[in-house]
């Protein structure tokens, strides 16, 4: 009996209820699956492929109907799917559910996703649970289809007291939860799904892009018109400028290269190494050079900078970036010495270059020290040196390079009476080491050859001075590298037990003269550097390195610095392999054939033990033992944090300065930066196109100017500009086939043939069309002759009032003026009735007028006054009256045509994805059509009717939908009957 009931309740094929649709879809899916299992797919691959395609289509249909059933039964109890916001746009497709089901069955059967073996193994238990739960749901739904189906019901009619209904409810909840978990896992394994941190970083990048655009608009790099017009060039300019701004201007933003790599956005994470190099080079640019680089990134114009490298101070802009490029005026003038002691080096240009470089290092550190002192002494006046004032306004990492640092500079006088000096590369190399290793960082085995390109050619010579003169020159200056350690006094600097601080820039006298055997080998063939080029500057710096709290402490009197005597008697077989200057090391490398035994016993840091005993800065005081505790106390003080801070700044200064020295000119540097920055930005366009489009779309919407609706009063146009060209339907179909744009109706093809352009009387059109942009203005003029008073003579000129009805029709906006209200329609109907009565009275008066009357009729009121007064007017009076009689035979039609309403606004194409009548989706071949009566969007089948619309001034047949056609035809028949009766009455009168 139960089987008979099931057979009786079996859904029919034309049943549209949810359960019936599921029953037939599931039955079709089962048939395809059975056929697919009935043969070997490898033997018949074509048939297998065809059946698999049908299988996936049926799976999509079954899951879609199941989803509708869950929406109705579960409602708010459905598992949330907010994670879909993380999915890319291309993933969210209509057949996503079918793909997930197919993937779950493949994983449950033991297959693995290609190149995702680990993820496949983790998802396999979940996939098996999904397929099992879905099979249970299908069985329960089929049972409900045979028991509780109501044919053609829009809702489900289940028995709530039945246990199977409750079981179905719980099974649907379990399946919904499992399917949501599998969807997240499967899509995350196939495509990259952003985390919460990544979304936050992407929002910060959007803010950076917006701030960059506003800054570019402020300094004149871009125009607001480009933003409003969505200029495609901005898609390339904004990311390039954002890289510069994120590295220099907003250095603590999302492009902060100091943060760990895993915290950077995935967009810039692959370019972290090159971005760090770009940042180091950008910090060497001044405001003018930075502006030229940004302009180059926007316009791709040639670089106008022809000045050599270092002609202006090189500084990175502070976060308060100047809105206009200004030439930096922080030129360092060295006024400490007037002596011109020309060195007798064989390479004068190289010597001068290295002299300037070392001097610049001292100047840089002086500025940093002055800044530190100014920060500690808030009540003290700022330094009188303009260079120091400029440095205090900037970040400590924003340093300056003097104008004399160009490799092509001419020989300049030495600022101090000094001998040939060491290269700045030693200081630059030591800057890459920790602050504690400033004195020994030059003895590493690895050499940065690409930085020190021409260092092998730098040699120095001695000017022949004796030992006493050398000692006089280096009094209190042989510890010159001590200025790298801030917040210290001479007691700290002269610590003999600590690592000596004289390796970076200055060589001691034992390096100059060495032992007797070393002098025998090198006496006349090698000249070694003896002193630094900025010893006096270092002496002044030492005075500023003391803490404010230590100013009252008794300062030990500096005396001459001499080497220890016991280390002057070193064995001859032990070479000075701890020399601080790299070019000196390379000098030994060039003479390696003379001393093959000297580099065999090289220690990792041998000078830590040898130089501390062989050479130290000693203080000739009365009681050295009494000063020792003071020095240890000072070293144990809490000044190490400030010392490391300033050491880091100096290290950054050395690295940036040396990096810039690789480039021959500013033009070369800017060109290299342009290539690197443009390369990174263009890679973003390729690798992260979707994210970049989304960010740029938000930036454009945030920064575009507010739209101001300007009402343009059209001027009188020429006859050739009266009409705009509009493409016909054939032109639109032939030229833009495949697009989803609307097809223009037949009325728009030849609008000049419409009667809406003719006036109420006369055979000449008085209405004019004015086009402004994409809109068209139609001015329809109605002449209303006021009824003269009873006492007025018959020949008196009647007063004419004009009522202008303007109708705006737009091709681009597809929006027109709002429809007239019902009160306005009633008022116009009364005006039409009054006008008909006036025309009848006027016709009667024209019949009573004499032939020679000069009073023109209302129909010929458009003629000029010269025509009325001419002799021809008398002879043509009868002809004019005949024309007026013919024109007044249909007064109602003329007035009804001219008194038109505004057409309804068209619904935009983007807001109508389906036909508003049959709900069929539009495609490239199923085009959109607008009804001219209601403004709705319909397909070609639902809008294949055409009818005239006199109320809108459209007397020719235009496209309308079926509903409007039935309504307009019925109303049109009634209006035409009334108009015919009125015309007959007018002709009879």
UniProtKB/Swiss-Prot annotation:
Basic residues composition-biased segments: 576-616
Comp. bias (Polar residues): 765-784, 794-811
GO cellular component annotations of the record: early endosome membrane
GO molecular function: zinc ion binding
Protein name: Lateral signaling target protein 2 homolog
Region ranges (Disordered): 308-466, 544-647, 754-905
Binding site for Zn(2+) 1: 915, 918, 939, 942
Composition-biased stretches (Basic and acidic residues): 623-633
Domain of life: Eukaryota
PROSITE patterns attached to this UniProt entry: ZF_FYVE (PS50178)
Composition bias, Acidic residues: 439-466
ZnF segments: FYVE-type: 909-969
Transmembrane segments: none
Protein function: Negative regulator of epidermal growth factor receptor (EGFR) signaling.
Family (UniProt): Belongs to the lst-2 family.
SMART domains, sorted: FYVE (SM00064)
Xref: InterPro entries: FYVE_LST2 (IPR043269), LST-2 (IPR051118), Znf_FYVE (IPR000306), Znf_FYVE-rel (IPR017455), Znf_FYVE_PHD (IPR011011), Znf_RING/FYVE/PHD (IPR013083)
Residues annotated with Phosphoserine modification: 549-550, 810
This protein's UniProt keywords: Metal-binding, Phosphoprotein, Zinc, Zinc-finger
GO BP: any one term: negative regulation of epidermal growth factor receptor signaling pathway
Binding site for Zn(2+) 2: 931, 934, 961, 964
One Pfam family named in its UniProt record: FYVE
UniProt lineage: Eukaryota, Metazoa, Ecdysozoa, Arthropoda, Hexapoda
Organism: Drosophila melanogaster (Fruit fly)
């Amino acid at each position: 009996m139960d089987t008979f009931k099931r057979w009786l309740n079996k859904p029919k094929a034309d049943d549209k209820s949810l359960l019936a649709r599921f029953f037939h879809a599931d039955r079709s899916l089962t048939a395809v699956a059975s056929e697919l299992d009935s043969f070997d797919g490898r033997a018949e691959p074509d048939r297998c492929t065809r059946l698999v395609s049908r299988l996936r289509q049926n799976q999509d249909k079954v899951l879609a109907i199941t989803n509708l059933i869950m929406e109705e039964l579960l409602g708010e109890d459905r598992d949330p799917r907010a994670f879909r916001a993380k999915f890319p746009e291309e993933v969210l497709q209509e057949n996503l559910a079918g793909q997930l089901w197919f993937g779950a069955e493949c994983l449950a059967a033991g297959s693995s996703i290609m190149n995702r073996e680990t993820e496949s193994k983790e998802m396999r238990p979940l996939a098996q649970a999904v397929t099992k739960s879905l099979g249970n749901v299908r069985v329960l739904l089929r049972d409900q289809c045979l028991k509780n189906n109501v044919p053609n019901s829009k809702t489900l009619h289940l028995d709530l007291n039945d246990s199977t209904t409750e079981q179905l409810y719980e099974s649907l909840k379990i399946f919904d939860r499992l399917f949501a978990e599998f969807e997240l896992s499967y899509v995350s394994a196939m495509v990259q799904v952003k985390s919460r941190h990544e979304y936050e970083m992407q929002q910060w990048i959007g803010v950076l892009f917006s701030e960059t655009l506003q800054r570019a608009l402020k300094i004149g790099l871009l125009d607001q018109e480009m933003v409003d017009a969505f200029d495609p060039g901005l898609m390339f300019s904004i990311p390039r400028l954002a890289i510069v701004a994120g590295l220099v201007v907003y250095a603590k933003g999302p492009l902060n290269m100091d943060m760990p790599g895993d915290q950077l956005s995935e967009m810039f994470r692959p370019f972290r190494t090159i971005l760090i190099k770009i940042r180091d080079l950008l910090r060497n640019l001044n405001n003018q050079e930075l502006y030229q680089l940004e302009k180059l990134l926007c316009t791709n114009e040639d670089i106008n900078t022809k000045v050599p490298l270092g002609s202006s101070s090189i500084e990175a802009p502070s976060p308060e970036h100047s809105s206009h490029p200004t030439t930096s005026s922080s030129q360092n003038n060295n006024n400490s010495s007037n002596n011109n002691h020309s060195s007798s080096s064989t390479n004068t240009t190289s010597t001068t270059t290295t002299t300037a470089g070392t001097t610049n290092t001292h100047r840089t550190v002086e500025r940093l020290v002055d800044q530190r002192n100014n920060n500690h002494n808030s009540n003290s006046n700022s330094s009188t040196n303009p260079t120091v004032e400029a440095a205090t306004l900037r970040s400590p990492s924003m340093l300056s390079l003097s104008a004399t640092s160009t490799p092509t500079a001419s020989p300049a006088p030495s600022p101090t009476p000094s001998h040939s000096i060491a290269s700045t590369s030693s200081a630059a190399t030591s800057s890459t080491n920790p602050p504690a290793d400033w004195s020994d960082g030059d003895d590493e085995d690895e050499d940065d050859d690409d930085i020190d390109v021409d260092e092998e050619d730098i040699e120095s010579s001695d000017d022949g001075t004796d030992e006493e003169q050398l000692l006089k020159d280096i009094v209190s200056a042989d510890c010159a590298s001590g200025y790298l350690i801030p917040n210290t006094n001479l007691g700290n600097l002269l610590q003999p037990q600590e690592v000596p601080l004289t390796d970076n820039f200055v060589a001691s006298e034992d390096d100059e003269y060495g032992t007797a055997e070393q002098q025998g080998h090198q006496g006349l063939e090698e000249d070694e550097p003896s002193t630094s080029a900025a010893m006096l500057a270092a002496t002044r710096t030492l005075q500023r390195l003391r803490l404010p709290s230590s100013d009252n402490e008794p300062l030990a009197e500096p005396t001459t610095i001499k080497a220890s005597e016991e280390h002057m008697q070193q064995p001859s077989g032990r070479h000075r392999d701890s020399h601080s200057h790299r070019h000196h090391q390379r000098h030994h490398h060039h003479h390696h054939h003379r001393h093959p035994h000297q580099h065999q016993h090289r220690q990792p840091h041998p000078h830590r033990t040898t130089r501390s005993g062989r050479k130290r800065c000693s203080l000739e005081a009365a009681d050295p033992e009494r000063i020792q505790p003071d020095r240890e106390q000072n070293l144990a003080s809490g000044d190490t944090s400030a010392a490391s801070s300033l050491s880091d700044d100096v290290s950054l200064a050395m690295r940036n300065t040396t990096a810039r020295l690789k480039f021959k000119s500013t033009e070369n540097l800017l060109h290299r930066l342009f290539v690197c920055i443009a390369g990174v930005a263009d890679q973003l366009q390729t690798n992260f196109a979707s994210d970049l489009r989304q960010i740029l779309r938000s930036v454009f919407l945030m920064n575009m100017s507010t739209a101001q609706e300007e009402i343009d009063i059209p001027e009188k146009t020429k006859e050739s500009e009266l009409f705009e060209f509009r493409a016909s339907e054939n032109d639109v179909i032939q030229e833009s086939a495949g697009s989803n744009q609307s097809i223009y109706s037949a009325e728009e093809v030849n609008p000049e043939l419409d009667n809406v352009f003719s006036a109420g009387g006369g055979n000449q059109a008085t209405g004019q069309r004015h086009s402004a942009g994409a809109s068209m203005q139609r001015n329809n003029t109605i002449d209303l002759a006021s009824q003269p008073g009873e006492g007025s003579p018959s020949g008196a000129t009647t007063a004419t009032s004009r009522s202008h009805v303007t109708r705006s029709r737009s091709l681009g906006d597809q929006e027109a003026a709002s429809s007239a209200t019902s009160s306005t329609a009633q008022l116009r109907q009364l005006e039409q009735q009054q006008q008909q009565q006036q025309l009848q009275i006027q016709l009667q008066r024209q019949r009573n007028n004499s032939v020679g009357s000069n009073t023109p009729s209302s129909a010929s009121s458009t003629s000029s006054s010269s025509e009325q007064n001419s002799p021809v007017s008398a002879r043509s009076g009868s002809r004019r009256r005949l024309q007026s009689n013919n024109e007044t035979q249909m007064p109602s039609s003329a007035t009804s045509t001219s008194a038109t309403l505004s057409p309804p606004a068209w619904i935009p194409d983007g807001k109508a994805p389906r036909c508003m009548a049959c709900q069929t989706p539009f495609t490239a071949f199923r085009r959109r059509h607008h009804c001219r009566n209601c403004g709705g969007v319909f397909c070609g089948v639902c809008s294949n009717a055409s009818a005239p619309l006199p109320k809108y001034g459209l007397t020719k047949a235009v496209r309308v939908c079926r509903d409007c056609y039935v309504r307009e035809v019925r109303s049109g028949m009634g209006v035409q009957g009334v108009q015919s009766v009125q015309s007959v009455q007018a002709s009879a009168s």
